[in-house]
Amino acid sequence: MITFKPITIEDKAEIESFTLPYAPANCDLAFANMFCWQFQFKTAWSVVDGFLVIRFQIGGSDRIGYMQPVGAGDFTPVLRHLEEDILAAGQRLRIIDMTPEGLEKLRSVGHCQFAFASDRNLEDYVYNASDLRDLPGRKYQSKRNHINRFEAEYEYRYEPMTRDHAAECMRLEAEWRKTRSGHTGELSAEQRAMQRAFAHFDRLGLIGGCIYVGDKLVAFTYGSPINDHTFCVHVEKADTEYDGAFTIINREFVAHLPEQYTLIDREEDLGIPGLRQAKLSYHPAFLEKKYTALCLYPDEIACKRLWIKCFGDEETFIDSFLIGHYSRKRMLAAEEDGRLAAMLHLIPFESELGRA
């Protein structure tokens, strides 16, 4: 078994000795994200054969996942250690946030037959810093119009964020949340993560910015590096009564970042239509694909083979089903001579009439 330990603030330097030189543009590999959300995912880490290995619990369940090992060179020798570790936990190997290059390496290893799938909802939006700073050309005309109206209507100032801004920022976040999902009085997971961020602001190396109109905070944002040239925006909030506040904080913040950060990762859209539209409106340079690799059980392999034989669907489609929807409890199967001959999958869904 691998000896993992929970991520703590004291681990920042060692973890970043792997992520800053080698990590892809993936928001999940920003140390501040791993630390601030540790309470949610029980994130733990270890160094195995010269690679950083991150382990976590998926969706609040007991299911274990590993991130693609981070380091220089070929990570595939680390796989046998992951297999031993997950076997000791009585589960099967699941690796998430794999790059396309990592996926190809995994395909070439005969340890296990994997299913691979990506989720558009979890792809990171990565922008050229110069585009967000300068808003050049016709495609950014609407953004420049927003800024021009804001600057014409309000006397504003930009302030670099410090821990002293925490109380004001949390109040604005609470007001913003009321307009989005209704106020329950309960502390959301994001609010807990923000509290951790502000409590350790300096030690995390966070960089943030605030927009004031007079003495009123109307927008704020903060983030941290993923690697030595990619900066990740973790949080961005604004008072929507001030038209253009989101646009102005976006531009001003990037304009005040160190020049070494040529790429800006604004994280994923989680499949939320409004968020997707907003992120696309800034014209990302690319979307960072993240693949999940799942070691298949024998019955799943048999299911996949029969599916291909009968229907000829692409493996990517079948793999996506196996990772996201397959369940032994909802599958009816018929065998002949010890081989799977027919199968029926029952998939629950929500309709206007209820759950079916």
Show where each model-derived region lies.
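Short amphipathic alpha-helix that is part of the acyltransferase structural core
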Residues: 1-27, 134-193, 294-346
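N-terminal ordered "arm"
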Residues: 6-53, 57-58
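Conserved beta-strand in the GNAT
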Residues: 45, 49-58, 210, 215-225, ...
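Conserved catalytic-core motifs of GNAT/GCN5-like acyltransferases
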Residues: 117-125, 285-296, 348-354
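A mid-sequence, solvent-exposed acidic-amphipathic segment
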Residues: 169-228, 232
